[in-house]
């Protein structure tokens, strides 16, 4: 009986050690990849943003959403007031194509940079800037980029003080 109990305990201990070692190995490999990569994730996303011509179609789409008073949650079927529905759809499709060319890890950071660029271009107030960020937040969902979903950044703008 003692031998069986010892065998069960030894098996459990071995399983625990193997599990612990594989978790440690995975973490170490991940950290080594980041350490050996001279360009960190932030710089890589910044570079992608610049190479993708600053997500021009997405910036134009966000700007139009803000001017039309739309926040988040639009769909590919939305109509645009001052353009025909087909032209608005094409602009959104171009934006989605730009986003699909990004690495999944860079989609939200580059969208945030694009939203900031749109906010700064027109010198919009806090309300309009909030709408721009809100539109950007939902673009991965609208474009059905499944690896990303919704961007986690806030729809409040850090360079505008909150109202109390």
Swiss-Prot record:
Query: What is the similarity comment for this entry?
Result: Belongs to the 2S seed storage albumins family.
Gene Ontology MF term list = nutrient reservoir activity; protein histidine kinase binding
Give UniProt keywords alphabetically. Disulfide bond, Seed storage protein, Signal, Storage protein
Q: Where would one find the signal peptide in this protein?
A: 1-21
Propeptide residue range(s)? 22-37, 73-81
Described purpose of this protein according to its UniProt entry:
This is a 2S seed storage protein.
Relate the assembly described in the record: The mature protein consists of a small and a large chain linked by disulfide bonds. Interacts with AHK2.
* Protein name stated in the entry: 2S seed storage protein 3
Q: Which domain of life is it from?
A: Eukaryota
A Pfam family of the record is Tryp_alpha_amyl
């Amino acid at each position: 009986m003692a031998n069986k109990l010892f065998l069960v305990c030894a098996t459990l201990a071995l399983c625990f050690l193997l599990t612990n070692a594989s978790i440690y190995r995975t973490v170490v490999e991940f950290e080594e990849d980041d350490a050996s990569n001279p360009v960190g994730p932030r710089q890589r996303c910044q570079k992608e943003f610049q190479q993708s011509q600053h997500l021009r179609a997405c910036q134009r789409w966000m700007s139009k959403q803000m001017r039309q008073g739309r926040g988040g949650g639009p769909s590919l079927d939305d109509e645009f007031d001052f353009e025909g529905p087909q032209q608005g759809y094409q602009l959104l499709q171009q934006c989605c194509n730009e986003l699909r060319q990004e690495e999944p890890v860079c989609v939200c950071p580059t969208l945030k940079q694009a939203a900031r660029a749109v906010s700064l271009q027109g010198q919009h107030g806090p309300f309009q800037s909030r709408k721009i960020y809100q539109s950007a937040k939902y673009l991965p969902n609208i474009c059905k980029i499944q690896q990303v979903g919704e961007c986690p950044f806030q729809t409040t703008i850090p360079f505008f003080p909150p109202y109390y």
